[in-house]
A protein has these predicted regions:
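Exported/periplasmic ABC-transporter solute-binding proteins
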Residues: 1-17, 22-218
Length: 218
């Protein structure tokens, strides 16, 4: 479209957003790899005992927010080569309903953006860990990686690429006017104030310097 209409294009990589896989607090199985997730949305895995690290038995259901959401597009494009999702996958209508469904059903895996993992609704504090939540956050592993290297979606593992379920957030503007609300908003998001707004949603800024500190426990 941009080329067809000869529109100027401004584009910028803003942040990295990760998806978390969540399960019921009573579910002992909190480990999964990307290939198993792919087989779930292909309808090849429909029961918990089919997982390599699975210890429980029974039907396995995967729930997400809405059929036309960015979550579904990510799973289709990044995990399933653009094909529709199959098997025991169900839309709940919203991320809040996904979390509620997981809290009520031990056989369910929920897919939500990490921004929805909060101790209290409306809280903007970045979590240092996920252990105080009403749900459990699964460890996710890349195919071929040792199980000791599987991770949860903490910002450090998003930044290093060790957590696999990550997407890039871009902003695009094609407004040809040099002074417009759209262009002003574009530069606002790139500036420090806009970056602080994005960072408050638990998304990792592309220009963030991730600090690594060694901790010695005595």
């Amino acid at each position: 479209i941009v080329q067809q209409h000869n529109l100027p294009l401004l584009q910028s990589k803003l942040a990295y957003d990760a998806f978390a896989l969540i399960v019921n607090k009573q579910n002992p199985d909190t480990v999964i790899n990307v290939n198993e997730l792919r087989q779930i949305i292909q309808g090849k895995i429909t029961r918990w005992e089919q997982l390599e690290m699975g210890t429980k038995k029974g039907e396995l259901n995967l729930v997400f927010d809405a059929s036309g959401s960015s979550t579904v597009r990510y799973m289709k494009d990044s995990l399933n080569r653009g094909k529709d999702l199959r098997g025991n996958v169900f839309a709940q209508g919203s991320n809040m309903k996904v979390i509620q469904t997981v809290k009520e059903n031990p056989n369910t895996i929920g897919v939500v953006s990490t921004d929805w993992l909060r101790l209290h609704q409306g809280d903007t504090t970045t979590l240092q860990n996920f252990y105080g939540l009403d749900v459990r956050v699964m460890l996710v592993g890349k195919v071929g990686k040792a199980k000791a290297d599987w991770q949860r979606p903490y910002q450090y593992y998003i930044a290093t690429g060790e957590y696999p379920l990550v997407r890039t957030v871009w902003e695009l503007v094609t407004d040809p006017r040099t002074r417009s609300t759209m262009r002003s908003f574009y530069f606002f998001l790139k500036d420090n104030d806009g970056q602080r707004v994005i960072n408050s949603s638990s998304q990792l800024l592309t220009r963030n310097q991730v600090q690594i500190k060694e901790v010695v426990i005595k």
